[in-house]
Amino acid sequence: MITHKFEHPLNEKTRIYLRVESLLRQLHLSSAFSDAQQYQLFFRSIFDLIEIFEQIQLKSELAKDIEKQRVTYKSWLDVEGVDQEMLTSLLNDISHIYRELMQAERFGQSLKEDRFLSAIRQRFNLPGGSCCFDLPALHYWLHLPLDKRVRDAETWMDSLQPLYEALTLWLKLTRETGHFKDQIARTGFFQSDADEANILRLSIPMQYGAYPMISGHKNRFAIKFMSFETGQACTQDIEFELAICS
């Protein structure tokens, strides 16, 4: 059975985390500059990240969440039935990533101070603003040898490595708290309690031709399935899998 998967955040902080994860993924995928257009995705991802960093103290928020996870997992030490070797290894990983995070610069600081990035950032977001007459510095950079451009990209991405590792860990551990369970949306509608959840994960069979519209918060949520063909609410029962992740 072919399915499609959705994730939905149940609070604003997690919403930002998922956006940053998506931007970091785009950044890594486009950093090889294997075709002439990848640089647009690469720089747009960098500038979108800088904008997020300017709006929220992401480093301090993420540090608090990583520490909260460490305290939770530490409480499982010496608990019967828990793999203590695996738990100790995980706690060591969390502690290492937390230390690296706390020692890192404010997210995006070196990117904002980079002369080349600063020179192209403002005009890059203009419609069609990446033309050579709008951004001659970018046009010159694009004609540098590929290995030079890749080295520059690696330098910019290296400054985000503590963020990447910490965010990847937090989201991984958060997702692992939820287990997919079979559910039925009667006449295309489903609602339930969430109990301090951060993320909903859905797996939906493609055969229904439907996608979810989700609303809610950390304690309660509702899912309304919409027909892709008509844009109207589904009236049929829809079987799907749901994981509620805390």
UniProtKB/Swiss-Prot annotation:
InterPro entries reported in the protein's UniProt record = ZapD, ZapD_C, ZapD_sf
Question: Where along the sequence do coiled-coil regions lie?
Answer: none
> What domain of life is recorded for the organism?
Bacteria
Q: What does the UniProt entry say about where the protein is found?
A: Cytoplasm
Q: What GO biological process terms does the UniProt entry carry, in alphabetical order?
A: division septum assembly; FtsZ-dependent cytokinesis
GO cellular component terms listed in the entry, alphabetical order: cell division site; cytoplasm
| SUPFAM superfamilies for this protein | YacF-like
One Pfam annotation, family name?
A: ZapD
Q: Which UniProt keywords apply?
A: Cell cycle, Cell division, Cytoplasm, Septation
What is this protein's function? Answer: Cell division factor that enhances FtsZ-ring assembly. Directly interacts with FtsZ and promotes bundling of FtsZ protofilaments, with a reduction in FtsZ GTPase activity.
Q: How does it assemble?
A: Interacts with FtsZ.
Protein family according to the UniProt entry? Belongs to the ZapD family.
What NCBIfam families does this protein map onto? PRK05287.1-3 (NF003655)
The molecule here is called Cell division protein ZapD
* Record organism: Vibrio atlanticus (strain LGP32) (Vibrio splendidus (strain Mel32))
Lineage summary:
Bacteria, Pseudomonadati, Pseudomonadota, Gammaproteobacteria, Vibrionales
